[in-house]
């Protein structure tokens, strides 16, 4: 009994520490996005955040949101179900009816996806597009599968069984297909074959999804059902995980691996469960109106982890919640000039630029721990009085500098 109480106490302390460590901020319609029902998210190679919602696609530049629609009359067609970016920088989005790509030059969504696919050697009418973890492109048409490797600039294709394909997942050397009948097959591009590895029993109705974590385990779930199963590819067996009954007491909507040994499982109404492999236990994160910076909603739609270790949570009612997985509260950057900082901006390389009220412009590189000051004496900036910045544009003043 004493041992049991000790275990329970340790679990409570661990869960409390996790909840205390994670602080969430919220981005919603009040912040500028078109709808609080957020279905998918993306941070592109330029640092813009994209939010696919029930009513419109949104791009956030750090200051404001811009909305994109494909029609002015049909709300259904403006529901964006998915968004991804391949290694070439092409952003692909999907509505209930069709696929679009984002034309950066014209700043609009284009429906003629053939324009981007033909140069890759893909000429068929495409029914499904998938971008994998290495940002390579997968396309499906009929019972034919295309795979384009951007690094090798190589297109491969193969035929798969005449079955309804529900989802594609690929990470490093493992590529798997989930069919609507519950069959999971592995793709071998060397032999150009598709071989069955396991047969699962799935609900007859609903959208079947598959997710591959960093340990190459497949998490299979069906939207709007409590069904959740896990299959270990490397060991070729089903994986039993802690808290399965607790998780399946609600509808599973999204799954993600945070890269730190935790599997995040988003539910329809009970918030987020975090399965920690090392501690072999289940943690629960939920909305707490009495706690500052808690999760904004228990109704989870989607997850997305960007390259800055920010985890984004799409909800059905409260927009987007996001948290820093590294829990870096503050980092001190000393400024020897000891002058008022009038503005600051982060560039696409992660460097922080500081504008001073009379001492010029400084650049701080947190990765290299390097600090450099630019002024009228050692650079070509027109003034030491920096009054603002916006979208990489610098604003100065010709007024007399107080510090000079």
Please describe what each predicted stretch is.
Residues 1-398, 404:
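Carboxylate-rich, polar loop motifs that coordinate divalent cations or form catalytic acidic clusters
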